[in-house]
């Protein structure tokens, strides 16, 4: 892929990732102002840190991506690019949680 084509593609993927983040964010924050409410709620229920919840969600997508790379087969109803975009969004969410934790120290 030529550099200009890659940049154009990457910009379109980032736009879609942002759309997904906003759409799914509404579902999981339940009109709360805390972007990480869902992770914190689950973490509290099972007595682990919110960052670990995000890592578990990320790893679920990474396993799917790994299986696709190794087999070349999509084994889910969700297209592989959807998994890649979700993984990148979980990295952003995890980064935000790390930033929040560092700010609270």
Question: Model regions: which residues?
Answer:
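Intrinsically disordered, low-complexity regulatory regions
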Residues: 1-105
């Amino acid at each position: 892929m030529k550099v200009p084509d890659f940049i154009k593609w990457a910009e379109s993927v980032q736009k879609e990732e942002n759309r997904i983040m906003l759409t799914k964010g509404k579902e999981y924050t339940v009109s709360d102002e805390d972007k990480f409410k869902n992770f914190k709620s689950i973490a509290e229920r099972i007595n682990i840190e919110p960052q670990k919840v995000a890592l578990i969600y990320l790893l679920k997508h990474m396993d799917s991506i790994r299986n696709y790379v190794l087999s070349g087969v999509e084994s889910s109803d969700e297209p592989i690019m959807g998994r890649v975009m979700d993984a990148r969004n979980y990295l952003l969410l995890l980064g935000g949680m790390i930033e929040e934790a560092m700010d609270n120290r």
